[in-house]
A protein has these predicted regions:
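Sec-dependent signal peptide cleavage junction
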Residues: 20-38
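Short, Lys/Arg-rich N-terminal segment immediately upstream of the first membrane anchor
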Residues: 1-4, 241
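Beta-rich interaction/scaffold domains
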Residues: 34, 40, 96-97, 102
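Terminal, intrinsically disordered low-complexity segments enriched in charged/polar
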Residues: 36-50
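Beta-propeller-forming repeat regions
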Residues: 51-74, 81-83, 90-95, 101, ...
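Sec-dependent N-terminal signal peptides of Gram-positive bacterial secreted proteins and lipoproteins
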Residues: 4-25
Length: 564
């Protein structure tokens, strides 16, 4: 494929290899970085009994048939150097014996059935027509897919013109049930409440640029980072629903506007100065009715609405450390959306609210087109080291870490079980056995990082400085930390991925002097910011940290690339 100039970096690192420098927990004098960071190691004995229990749970896991999207193969043909790359989707329902035949303008291209999900057609012409046919036991089944080769290696289209708007987020889902993804965009204008003349919107488009609908969020959200939405086929009808927080003044894709639901005569709560709060140059609305709404994916029409839980009121519940309205409103406004199979079969919407102090959560599934509440969780005991109070990130992951067939909700240093109960808050221990709960952080990864272990592991960073481990590697089922680094400063980023084939399993790294390591905690370099990278356009970055914002599988092998 022709190389684009997108910043995707081949991530096999060149560095001087070191023997393990891990030790028993050391204080901050273990390492002094030239940039002023001090670094110590935290190491705990791996609980082999719990590790064995995880393997037993994995072997005995139920084989649930989960309700998934009904997608097609996603057949595409993209021009590259000296030919066309044709690729398609492998589905979770596919049999191990399924193979394929590929045709171009009626001519079969493969000598024997294709066992992979791509084929490079040398010398193909632009706009050639390709047909993919499924093969079982050497015979074509009659199921086939057709596509026309693109004239360039991307597709683009014009969006609806909106003066002063930025596109700053997006998602994909099959909104109309044709088996192909459509595109959803979040677009925001100026969010200054004193000067704005328009409001944030969510738009849906087909990949040919056809505009499907627009939802106008209205005047009662003025902080774009708190505008989240989820798009997925929640009820199994073949079409994705769109689920998001809504307000009085929100207008759906059919032009229906939510009115004065509480009868107080107000639908724009941003007009009152006393109802506005500012914290670190961001504006927040202190009090407004909040809802959770379902929108038809094909039309954008609201089909159900319920009161949003957990409520952000009273504000005093969201911190015992602060009493100023700005901080309290910021904490109450922070929320995360996710999708989890809490019963092991059907998807539920999960909301987690709060991060730095109080953490609350709720979940719903969709039944007969209506919200059905699964549970609501309130974190009560702020003084309990085992409580998830103060232990939540800006992101969440849903995954079945205990292999009971049902998803858990993980957010950095905490986990909530499928039934809404707290599983654990991650802790570390000093040499006297005293526990320290690890706090809120900005990034984490959950994956099967060790090829010799079937359990999930978490690599996470934490904001608070001078923790015994403010970047660490822990068991995602039990929360037990195996090793980590202590810092004298906030560790704001971390990343875990398999980027180097010379080490078993994943590699881990992070910001603020986090030296890259293997999954055993052995340093694999003598620096954290002296690397050279070849970007996809062939240029080289020198004296750089390993990028840690996003990872992708880009070039067809089993190593990760880094998108930055």
């Amino acid at each position: 494929m022709k190389k684009n100039k997108i910043r995707v970096i081949s991530a096999v690192v060149s560095a001087i290899m070191l023997a393990s420098s891990a030790s028993a927990f050391a204080k901050f004098d273990a390492y002094n970085d030239p940039d002023g960071f001090t670094l110590g190691h935290y190491e705990a004995e791996v609980n082999q009994e719990q590790r064995a229990d995880t393997e037993k749970l994995y072997e005995q896991r139920p084989k649930n048939e989960r309700q998934f999207e009904n997608l097609s193969r996603g057949l595409i043909a993209v021009p590259g150097e000296n030919g066309t790359l044709v690729s398609w989707r492998f589905l979770g329902t596919d049999s191990n014996s399924l193979t394929y035949n590929l045709y171009c303008s009626g001519e079969k291209l493969n000598d024997k059935p294709i066992t992979t999900t791509n084929f490079f057609h040398t010398g193909a012409s632009t706009n050639a027509e390709y047909t993919l046919k499924e093969v079982e036991n050497g015979e074509e089944t009659g199921v086939e897919y057709t596509t026309t080769a693109w004239d360039k290696n991307y597709i683009g289209f014009k969006v609806t013109e909106r003066e002063g708007y930025n596109i700053d987020d997006g998602a994909v889902a099959d909104l109309d049930g044709d088996g192909e993804y459509e595109i959803l965009l979040r677009r925001v204008p100026s969010m200054d409440v004193n000067t704005r003349t328009s409001y944030p919107v969510i738009e849906a488009y087909k990949t040919d640029g056809t505009h499907m609908w627009t939802i106008d969020i209205g005047p009662n959200e003025i902080n774009e980072v708190d505008i989240n939405f989820l798009a997925y086929d929640m009820d199994g009808d073949g079409k994705a629903e769109v689920i998001m927080r809504s307000f009085e003044g929100t207008t759906d894709g059919k032009g229906n506007t939510t009115g004065d639901t509480n009868g107080d005569g107000i639908t724009d709560y941003s007009k009152s100065e006393s109802n506005l709060a500012i914290f670190k140059d961001r504006q927040y609305i202190v009090s407004t009715p909040e809802f959770l709404s379902i929108y038809d994916g094909e039309t954008g029409e609201e089909t159900d609405r319920t009161d949003l839980k957990p409520s952000k009121e009273p504000l005093s519940d969201w911190s015992y450390r602060y009493s100023d309205t700005g901080r309290l409103t910021k904490r109450a406004s922070h929320y995360l959306f996710g999708l989890a199979y809490l019963d092991g079969v059907t998807p539920s919407v999960v909301m987690v609210r709060g991060a730095w102090d109080n953490v609350r959560a709720a979940a719903w599934h969709i039944e007969d087109g209506k919200f059905k509440e699964d549970w609501v969780h309130n974190t009560e005991n702020k003084d309990d080291v085992n409580s998830i109070w103060g232990a939540c990130n800006h992101n969440l992951v849903t995954v079945d870490v205990d292999f009971d067939g049902k998803d858990e909700i993980l957010s950095g240093p905490m986990a909530i079980d499928h039934d809404g109960s707290e599983m654990y808050a991650v802790k570390v221990y000093d040499n006297d056995g005293n526990a320290q709960k690890l706090a809120h952080g900005d990034a984490f990864d959950v994956a099967k990082t060790d090829p010799d272990f079937n359990g999930y592991m978490t690599w996470a960073c934490h904001e608070t400085s001078q923790l015994m481990a403010n970047i660490e590697y822990h068991d995602a089922r039990t929360g037990e930390v195996q090793w980590g680094y202590s810092k004298n400063k906030d560790t704001g980023r971390s990343r875990s991925a398999d980027i180097d084939p010379t080490h078993k399993g994943f590699e881990v790294w992070g910001s603020t002097a986090t030296i890259p390591a293997n999954i055993s905690g052995e340093n694999i370099a003598d620096t954290w910011n002296g690397f050279k990278f070849r970007k996809i356009d062939g240029t080289v970055d020198s004296d750089a940290t390993i990028p840690m914002n996003f990872k992708v599988y880009w070039d067809g092998d089993l190593l990760s690339e880094l998108l930055d």
